[in-house]
């Protein structure tokens, strides 16, 4: 079984970025506060833009949930009204499985019909994904009895981060043993590294979330470059190593240049972290312009080479060898010439 959807796809709830600038937020819907997940995002699957709107809409099902007509009804409703917020599925939040919807509907619709109600169209099961063919969640995919070594730390009112206690091997990993290479903030470095994001941020917290993972929480102030939307709020930067390189300390105001990987913002050894200076930020903007110019030049050269290659294939060069040899004379004339003397000999003998 997978460990809390925490989850069907090893998705960790500590990640709290948002879509189009909207961060994940703590679940505030009373009916859903005891679900195995504790952060959600809006709009939900029913297009409610705020949790306040979702609360008003979900209240109509409270009596149905209270009579316990189905063991999965509450789970299904919360998966629709307060979907799980995970970094890997920001643009298309995970839906409940079709089988969960069908179980809730089949269990509760007979009772609803007794009061002249039918299963609502807005909760139709037909469009929901099937477990074997798509990404979806069901109660069976979630372990609710988490091990004792797992606890939740509230970093901000709107973000939860999971932390595990370390085993003996992890405790022996001292930061003093790590030797980080200094990356110099130069144009040559910027052009060669081709970073995917550049931000101005303040370091809020640095914490080890496993033997080979360090999470650095930063408060994003300015965004100079990014491949995907970065919210101006607190976001986690992931270091997938036992060493945190480059070294940074909490409460520093810094300029960070690094990479995104599978929608995660990474903080890796070959990335650049410098104390914030206006002059350096202006340089980074100029470096990005040079990088774009360099990439356009490379692209233009590739297009020219491609066109030249296509032209040479369609119009092959003519051969410059020796001229062709002349054709031999027709053999018929030679045959006639040879046969002429034979006729004259026949005439002489006849005479």
From Swiss-Prot:
Disulfide bonds join 24-85, 32-78, 69-108, 97-136, 101-125. Residues 306-318 have a biased composition (Low complexity). Keywords: Developmental protein, Differentiation, Disulfide bond, Glycoprotein, Secreted, Signal, Wnt signaling pathway. Pfam families: Fz, NTR. It is found in: Secreted. One of its GO terms (cellular component) is nucleus. It comes from the Eukaryota. GO terms for biological process: bone morphogenesis; cell differentiation; negative regulation of canonical Wnt signaling pathway; negative regulation of cell population proliferation; negative regulation of non-canonical Wnt signaling pathway; negative regulation of sodium-dependent phosphate transport; phosphate ion homeostasis; positive regulation of canonical Wnt signaling pathway. Disruption phenotype: Mice laking Sfrp4 have increased trabecular bone, reduced cortical-bone thickness, and failure of bone modeling during growth, resulting in wider bones with thinner and mechanically inadequate cortexes. Expressed in the ovary. Localized to granulosa cells of periovulatory follicles and corpora lutea. Weakly expressed in adult tissues including kidney, brain and lung. Glycans are attached at residues 38, 68, 116, 194, 240. Belongs to the secreted frizzled-related protein (sFRP) family. This is Secreted frizzled-related sequence protein 4.
């Amino acid at each position: 079984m997978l460990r809390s959807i925490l989850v069907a796809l090893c998705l960790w709830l500590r990640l709290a970025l948002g879509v189009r600038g909207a961060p994940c937020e703590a679940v505030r819907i009373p009916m859903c506060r005891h679900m195995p997940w504790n952060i959600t995002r809006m709009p939900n699957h029913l297009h409610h833009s705020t949790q306040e709107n979702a609360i008003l809409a979900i209240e109509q099902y409270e009596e149905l949930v209270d009579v316990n007509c189905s063991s999965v009804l509450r789970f299904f409703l919360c998966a629709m009204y307060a979907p799980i917020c995970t970094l890997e599925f920001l643009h298309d939040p995970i839906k409940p499985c079709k089988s969960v919807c069908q179980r809730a509907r089949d269990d509760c619709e007979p009772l609803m019909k007794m009061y002249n109600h039918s299963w609502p169209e807005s909760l139709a099961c037909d469009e929901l994904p099937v477990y074997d063919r798509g990404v979806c969640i069901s109660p069976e995919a979630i372990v609710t009895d988490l091990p004792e070594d797992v606890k939740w730390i509230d970093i901000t009112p709107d973000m939860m981060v999971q932390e595990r206690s370390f085993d003996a091997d992890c405790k022996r990993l001292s930061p003093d043993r790590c030797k980080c290479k200094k990356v110099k903030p130069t144009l040559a470095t910027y052009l060669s590294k081709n970073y995917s994001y550049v931000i101005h941020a303040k370091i809020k917290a640095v914490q080890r979330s496993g033997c080979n993972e360090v999470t650095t929480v930063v408060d994003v102030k300015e965004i100079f470059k990014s491949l995907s939307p970065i919210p101006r709020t607190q976001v986690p930067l992931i270091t997938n190593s036992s060493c945190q390189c480059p070294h940074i300390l909490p409460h520093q105001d810094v300029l960070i240049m690094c990479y995104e990987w599978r929608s995660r913002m990474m903080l890796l050894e070959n990335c650049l972290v410098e104390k914030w200076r206006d002059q350096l930020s202006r340089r980074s903007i100029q470096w990005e312009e040079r990088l774009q110019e360099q990439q356009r030049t490379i692209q233009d050269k590739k297009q020219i080479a491609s066109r030249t290659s296509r032209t040479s294939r369609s119009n092959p060069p003519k051969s410059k060898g020796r001229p062709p040899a002349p054709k031999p004379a027709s053999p018929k004339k030679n045959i006639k010439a040879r046969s002429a003397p034979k006729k004259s000999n026949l005439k002489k003998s006849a005479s």
